Amino acid sequence: VKEVSNDFKEMTIRDFKQLYDEMDGIADGCNANGCKTTVDEIIAWNFYYSIPYWYSTKSDSRNRKEGGSSDRCSAFMAVGKDWTTDGEIVCAHNSFTDFIDGQFSNIVLDLNPEKGHRFIMQTSPCWVWSGSDFFVTAKGIIGTETTIGGFVPYEKRFPIGYRIRHAMQYGNSLDDYCKILLHENSGDYANSWLFGD
């Protein structure tokens, strides 16, 4: 926890202050209700799916060239009159997770931030992003993803959780999503994103 927080806390405060404030508030709320935690633990917990990519840079060089994380999700989206009966979007997503962590992705969170767009997402307790990657925004954008297994390249830049949350909240178009997701892309939790509007 300390090592993850040491690597990402400063960046979180500097580049994603709103998310840091949310995580600090989550920690305060947990503590006030008898669940002892720290903002450092909340940052590490939000980085959970990115840890295998990040950790490969901390271990021997062989792990940076081989393997990578396994597939974790599968998704499907059909958009438009040529693909669906009524021209509306059809979207499906399933998660390939172990019971130990998958059991916690059982929250549907409706978030209406002071700035940006309201959105609904499937998520886990104390997360500021979906992680299970299924969401719908008030801007009319639906999103999900399918993981790219075996992807190894990683650079310490902005984690996927911060980038996709920023896109969900502030993205006005599919082009915005592309720009936000590609900006400072670290390569962590590699996946193919499917969006519809």
Regions found by a protein language model. Give the residues of each.
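N-terminal mature-domain region immediately after signal-peptide cleavage
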Residues: 1-175, 180-188, 192-196
